[in-house]
Amino acid sequence: MKSTLYSLALLIALAALTLSCCKGNKTDQSTMDNSNIPAPVMIDDTTVNGLTVYYPQFSSIDLVCGTMPSQQDTNVVFCAEAAFTHELLDEFDHSNIDGDHVSGGKRYKGAKCKDNSGAFAWFGDTTWEFVNGEYSELLDSVAAAGGMGFGQAIIIHDGESIRPLWREGTNRYRALCEKDGRLCIVDSRDEVTYERFVALLEAFAPTHALYMDMGAGWNHSWWRNSDGKVHEIHPVAEKSRYCTNWITFYK
């Protein structure tokens, strides 16, 4: 009898563990204490390890496609290029964004991209998720929830660095991160090798980090301070007109 009860208890425990693993690791913003973050963006200028960290205080996120959010839209507190753009085209089409993506609660088919090793998704409420690996089911779920999502190269997942070091040359790199249960955008302060940027991120120790598109033109981005003043992180450049998508945080 004891053996039977023990076996039953073991099966129940294993089933619970399996269900827990299948759910993924969503983060719920509503459980976080944001009292120490002034609206709408806090900049943590971490000069010591060569990073600038932007913490948007937001109520919603979307992947805006086709036209960059206007600086006159006072509801926007931060926006930056997210997924890769496949080709330099004069006209916008969702198929020119690398990887399937969700914008405004609708899933779109994008171009194939072997570098998209993970994804980020916002579920349209207070929860988000970073994924390492296949993310098609995640996009279906987030579209059904009215959220947003896009694929990119995962750098760090669950605190572990993901290899290979696939970028060449020096650049001012950027990543979307989760740090201490909060979303932030992390930029290298100077031009560095990708390997150096990963090392800086490892020292910053986020739970998750997902690459964001950068380079001259692609790095044009901006944020709004608590007085409503817009600050451009990088100016408009020749190739900025080819940008296709922007992760956008709304107050």
Where are these predicted regions, by residue range?
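C-terminal motif of bacterial Sec signal peptides marking the signal peptidase cleavage site
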Residues: 18-21
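Zymogen propeptides
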Residues: 23-112, 186-187
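Conserved beta-alpha junction segments in alpha/beta enzyme cores
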Residues: 150-175, 180
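Bacterial N-terminal signal peptides that target proteins for export
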Residues: 1-9
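Active-site-adjacent helix-turn-beta-strand microarchitecture at beta-sheet edges
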Residues: 89-160
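Conserved, well-ordered active-site substructure
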Residues: 92-108, 167, 178, 182-191, ...
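Short glycine-rich loop/turn motifs
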Residues: 116-118, 170-175, 243-244
